[in-house]
Amino acid sequence: MIIFGIDPGLSGAISVLENKKVIEVFDMPTMIDGKKNKRQVNGAHVTNIIKERIDNEKEIAVVVEHVNAMPGQGVTSMFNFGQSFGVIKGICSALSLPIYFVRPTKWKKHFNLIKTNKEASRTKVIEVYPEISSKLHRKKDSNKADAILIARYFNDTQV
């Protein structure tokens, strides 16, 4: 089974796991849109990442973190996040891929990461997958770690 783990949002990430092994991990592809140079998810690039890794012989699952609005988050920020989330859902629908949603508390509890900082998920992934530590060397790579753990959670609990 090939599992795509997705931490949605402009600073999110996409991971690809097969047989509990991390095949690849990407920062969320973005592009600049409009006169105000606002970033948004590059749907075409996300589509290519997924399509190029689909093997018709294997079962596919796309697992997306299901996040709600956070207190103190502005209206524009919530709209942008929702737009990114919608792009990912649309891509999966267009490609006829099964999409599953997991709340952050579910996958974080599975890995004992409740009430920890963002750095903890990166540390956890490096412990489990030391061979990819070079891909997670920056602090901002915690989003890549989240995407990996989202896919791994699905693998551990659903497969």
Predicted regions span which residues?
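Phosphate- and other anionic-substrate recognition elements at nucleic-acid/protein interfaces
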Residues: M1-V159
